[in-house]
Amino acid sequence: MGRHILLAFLSILALAAPASAKTAAKGPPRGDWTHVVASTPAGGFVLGNPNAKVKLVEYGSLTCPHCRAFDQEGVPTLLGKYVRPGQVSWEFRNYVRDAADLTAALIARCNGARSFFPLTRALYKDQPVWFGKAAGTPKEQLEKLADLPPQRQFVAMAKLAGLDAWAAAHGLPAAKSNQCLANVKSVDQLVHMNHDATEQHPDFAGTPTFLINGALVKDVASWGSLEPKLKAALGG
């Protein structure tokens, strides 16, 4: 990842002071589709029935307060009422807004599909703590990160935000999390996912953004406004 890209993320941070083609579909364990998760060709992770009538995609940022509100207010109902019985599948695609967001995304994705959703939800729960630390870091200290080798930039960002200790407390030993944070290919993938989102969806207006069966849903950023759209797509 180039210096100019990291600096762009740092400037934003300062302002903030079906299953995958790679994975064969299987029936749900114990009749619960929330136990079925896979990676997707778009770089996201999908939870639920790959043959669900309604396929929901969320573009989310881990430092976005509206995304956190959706996670807390809407995801429990989304999972329990719609994903579990197989009516809706839910794909989450990271859309990174800043350096802290990218760091958190690398940690959430570190163990692949099996732990992505639990880690993502835990990061949202604790967002005020770790993002608060990142946003409170002096600008001069953040800018020094860009002078580090690419393999060390996000390891250092994790320490500033307390995400190194957070990862260890959530089952990712330092050796594992540091390996993921130093993976330049994973960083490049997240950057390309941002590009793909805006390239494929000209009306993309920030996070959270939702697609229902491939179509962008305009003017929807909360569970209260999304659920009626899901019901309509289900024919209810």
Which stretches of residues belong to each language-model region?
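Extracytoplasmic thiol/disulfide redox context detector
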Residues: 2-102, 191-200, 235-236
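Intrinsically disordered, low-complexity peptide-like regions
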Residues: 2-3, 211, 228
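Alpha-helical elements of the RecA-like P-loop NTPase motor core of helicases
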Residues: 65, 188, 228
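Cysteine-centric redox/oxidoreductase cores and disulfide-bonded domains
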Residues: 96-206, 211-215, 220-224, 232-235
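Solvent-exposed, non-membrane alpha-helical residues enriched in polar/charged side chains
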Residues: 79-80, 227, 231
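Amphipathic alpha-helical segments in well-structured domains
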Residues: 75, 223-227
